[in-house]
Regions:
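Conserved pre-ATP/AMP-binding loop-to-beta segment of ANL
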Residues: 17-20, 140-158, 164-165, 188-193
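Conserved AMP-binding/adenylate-forming core of the ANL superfamily
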Residues: 22-55, 59, 64-68, 76, ...
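Conserved AMP-binding A3 loop
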Residues: 33-37, 154-181, 212
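Adenylate-forming
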Residues: 111-121, 217-220, 238-284, 295-303, ...
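Conserved AMP-binding/adenylation subdomain of ANL enzymes
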Residues: 177-194, 199-241
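AMP-binding/adenylate-forming catalytic core of the ANL superfamily
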Residues: 236, 243, 250, 351, ...
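Conserved AMP-binding/adenylate-forming
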Residues: 283-297, 301-382, 389-391
Length: 476
């Protein structure tokens, strides 16, 4: 049966024409607010610009637009006509964009403003055309949504590249609809909820649910430029109820909020994801947001969420790995056997986590998605992560996430990477802590002979998107 993910958002916008659905940061602490009606107008204008170029259903269209309201509306307009929006990899330069254009056989590239001579020359040489969308005139014409096959891609994005080069991720209309339903079921929205999403997929989910989204005021949406003082002002001024983010983001906020003795009573729930979440971070956030329930959300570009854990007051065992909680009832999860790990004297079968289900994007010709994460199910049937593919060797009942989580219990440790080789583990630690102190932490939990070296590093390399996932193949 033909579908279109945008149809869900379209109907929500029609029902909420007067409601502010997006508050986008503007200059000097202000925001530009967009009602359902205003969003429909912008989407309609871009839709007409696309149709004027005779773009057809299933045709890929590259979005070379900075993170902005224009980007969101262009993405939705492309979906509306049944075409396929393609997002480039994080921080892709000109060469990266041209590679996407070549690999995906793209003929149309959406940009905000008029291209310079160099861009026009590249377009002529590579046989593609620019479509400018900023400041388009209003179009007084009803938006018609084009139905497409459920398996047609609704969005092409790229992974973070934590296990190598960023790979294209194809999410179909059926998968996006299923992800929206699972998120809605897992975290039911409530009337007048004000959310503060860092992740773009949550913004799309909010639009489909009719939840107001306030976007974090981050320059050019480059996470490394986040100013915790500005975010604090937004949380207070906008009356934020819920917020999501990754480890880098919440670490930056936490350090500033603790330093200035700030706490926020309006926030009712926090979701942390995007990479393994240190237990100490999750517990520390409970002090800053005393009325909030803290959730650890485990997912991937292909499936969101896979598992969710509500963080209690007591930390998990330091060698448990990263505990991510209860697997979604809509997910069929299996562990490709790799051996056993030991936690507090108990042995658990461990393996690569493979999943399938209605909200999982699976490549054609494969039966299940290999997540690249290794883990086990504990006695409460909760999922714990123990390793990342490429660094998954088991040594004396241990995998690298177990050691890293144990070290991250100490607030002096900013990052830790345990590289496993045949002889044992080689530790690389970033933070204000000495090698002997690192050794003393681990002696409490393991036979220290498994540690073959400890090295301090000023910076441990991480991915470009989340700034949180360690690039183990680049740790030296």
């Amino acid at each position: 049966m033909p579908v279109n993910f945008f149809a869900t958002i379209f109907q929500t916008l029609l029902r909420n024409k007067e409601k502010e659905l997006i508050r986008w940061p503007a200059e000097e602490g202000s925001s530009k607010n967009y009602t359902g009606h205003e969003l429909l107008e912008k989407i309609g204008a871009i839709r007409m610009a696309l149709l004027n170029q005779h773009i057809t259903p299933s045709q890929p269209v590259l979005l070379a637009v900075p993170v902005s309201i224009d980007l969101i509306c262009a993405l939705l307009a492309i979906q509306a006509i049944g075409a396929v929006p393609v997002l480039p990899p994080a921080k892709a330069g000109a060469g990266g964009l041209l590679k996407v254009i070549r690999d995906r056989k793209i003929r149309f590239v959406v940009i905000a403003r008029s291209p310079n001579l160099l861009r026009r020359t590249a377009a002529w040489m590579k046989n593609f055309k620019f479509i400018m969308i900023h400041g388009l005139p209003e179009v007084h014409q009803e938006i018609l949504v084009t139905d497409v096959p459920p398996a047609q891609p609704a969005l092409v994005s790229h992974s973070s590249g934590s296990t190598g080069a960023a790979k294209a991720v194809y999410r179909s209309h059926a998968v996006l609809l299923a992800q929206h339903q699972v998120l809605k079921e897992t975290f039911p929205p409530w009337p007048d909820q004000v959310d503060f999403p860092l992740f773009p997929n949550i913004l799309l989910h909010n639009l489909a649910a009719g939840t107001t989204s306030v976007l974090p005021d981050i320059p050019r949406f480059e996470l490394s430029k986040v100013d915790p003082a500005v975010i604090a002002g937004q949380l207070i001024r906008e009356g934020i109820h819920t917020l999501t983010g990754n480890v880098y983001y919440f670490k930056k906020l936490l350090a500033y909020f603790e330093q200035h003795a700030l706490y926020f009573l309006c926030v009712q729930a926090i979701g942390i994801g995007g990479s393994p979440v240190p237990e100490l971070l999750a517990l520390s956030l409970k002090k800053i947001f005393p009325r909030a329930t803290i959730f650890i959300i485990y997912g991937s570009s292909e499936a969101e969420p896979i598992a969710v854990r509500m963080v209690g007051d007591e930390p998990v065992h330091p060698l448990a790995g990263y505990k991510v909680g209860t697997v979604s009832k809509h997910i069929q999860l299996a562990l490709a056997p790799a051996g056993e790990v030991v936690v507090a004297g108990k042995r658990y079968p461990v393996g690569e986590i493979t999943i399938k289900g209605p909200h999982v994007a699976i490549s054609t010709g494969t039966e299940a998605l290999g997540t690249g994460d290794f883990g086990y199910l504990d006695e409460h049937n909760e999922l714990c992560l123990t390793a990342r593919k490429g660094n998954e060797l088991i040594c004396k009942g241990l995998q690298h996430y177990q050691l890293e989580q144990a070290l991250m219990q100490d607030q002096r440790v900013e990052r830790a990477a345990a590289i496993v080789r045949k002889d044992g583990f080689h530790l690389y630690v970033q933070g204000n802590i000495g090698e002997q102190e690192i050794s003393n932490i681990l002696k409490k939990w393991i036979d220290i002979s498994v540690i073959k070296s400890i090295s301090k590093r000023n910076r441990i390399p991480v991915d470009q998107r989340h700034l949180s996932k360690i690039l183990y193949n680049k740790v030296r």
